A protein has these predicted regions:
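Catalytic-loop region of hydrolases
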Residues: 1-37
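Short, intrinsically disordered, low-complexity segments enriched in Ser/Thr and Pro
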Residues: 48, 101-104
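Short beta-strand immediately N-terminal to the catalytic nucleophile in serine-hydrolase-like folds
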Residues: 128-130
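Conserved acidic catalytic loop of the alpha/beta-hydrolase fold
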Residues: 93-100, 107-126
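Catalytic micro-motifs at enzyme active sites that drive phosphoryl/nucleotidyl and oxygen chemistry
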Residues: 13-15, 58-62, 115-116
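Conserved phosphate-coordination/catalytic loops
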Residues: 20, 104-107
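N-terminal cap/lid subdomain of alpha/beta-hydrolase-fold enzymes
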Residues: 27-90
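Short, well-ordered alpha-helical packing segments
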Residues: 23, 41, 113-117
Length: 130
């Protein structure tokens, strides 16, 4: 398992709010070969630690075999485990966004994941699950 963060730059929500310097926290398992990426989505209160909340499913020889697949799991926009969200520092004062964090939609979360996948060089997903 590998822990990473990647910046996707500024993100504009579908409501028009601007969030500068969005960082996405994620984990990967396996080796990327261009056509073997599997994106695992977490529950509303989940995080990028899919191997912890799906124990026994991700790994060599398991249902999501990391000898065959490159498995990616992100923490969603607005999440509390490393991706930009209410606990992140606000660019104006360095204090946590808190209630100043803009309202986000599922479309916003999906778009951030799409921008994230482009940023790490994944152009095609073999599967999306969660």
């Amino acid at each position: 398992m590998t822990n990473y963060h990647v910046s996707i730059g500024e993100f504009v929500t579908e409501a028009g709010a601007r969030i500068p310097n969005v960082e996405v926290a994620y984990h990967t398992w396996g080796t990327f070969r261009g056509d073997n990426a599997v994106l695992v989505e977490h529950a509303l209160t989940g995080d990028q630690h899919a191997d912890e909340w799906w124990p026994g499913l991700i790994g060599p020889g398991l249902a999501i075999d990391t000898r065959q697949y490159f498995v990616i799991c992100t923490n969603v926009l607005g999440g509390c485990k490393g991706t930009t969200g209410p606990s992140s520092p606000h660019p104006d004062d360095g204090e946590a966004y808190g209630s100043r964090f803009p309202a986000i939609s599922i479309r916003d979360q999906v778009e951030v994941e799409y921008q994230f996948l482009k940023a790490i060089g994944v152009e095609h997903l073999f599967a999306v699950m969660g």
